[in-house]
Amino acid sequence: MDCRSLYDLWCEKVTDPELQADLKGMDESGDEAVIEDAFYRTLEFGTAGLRGVLGAGTNRMNIHTVGQATQGIADFINGQVNDGEPGTVAICYDSRINSQLFAHTAASVLAANGIKSYVYPRLQPTPALSFATRYLGCAIGINVTASHNPSKYNGYKVYGPDGCQIASEIADAITKAIEGVDMFDDVRTMPFE
């Protein structure tokens, strides 16, 4: 699908007012390069998770790209279930724009997939997530942070059960699961509260 077709799909599917305003602004700018930059690719998931500029589009950090990544992680975890016991996930976030929203989005998707998550109730540094992931015996840890990047960025870092950044073979398996998820039709979710 080309960039303009993806843009049109997002205009049809997105209900979040902030993202709708961003989409409208792209079109009103009259600059096709703005739309192309937001939609020319999908944010790539790797050993460090996702990281990108905030805003509407497949090449941006937003509730839809976070939801898609989390659904892929949920599918990965549920495919690894031992003895019928679902895995658990620890989640923390920093003070960046939308970090708490993205953490709650991830928890909502995990819950809808039968996965319990432990979400810190307030801002936490990365070592707190590493500790919680190990201490609670979680399958995965998710840290919503863009680390050292400028404020227009946010990120979604994934840690293994050892509290460390995931290995490349796990990142590859999660990437494959994410690629099989349609961000508008396949993401299961429920209210956070």
Annotate each language-model stretch with its function.
Residues 50-52, 57-59, 96, 124-125, ...:
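Short, glycine-/Ser/Thr-/acidic-enriched flexible segments
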Residues 7-106:
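An N-terminal, well-structured beta->alpha segment
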Residues 14, 34-38, 43, 154-193:
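Gly/Ser/Thr-enriched, mixed-charge loops and adjacent short helices
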Residues 9-12, 82-161:
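Ferredoxin-reductase
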Residues 47, 111, 190:
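Conserved short alpha-helical segments that host acidic/polar catalytic motifs at enzyme active sites
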Residues 1-5:
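Eukaryotic N-terminal low-complexity, Ser/Thr- and Lys/Arg-rich leader segments
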Residues 25, 68, 72-75, 128-132, ...:
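Alpha-helical scaffold segments in soluble metabolic enzymes
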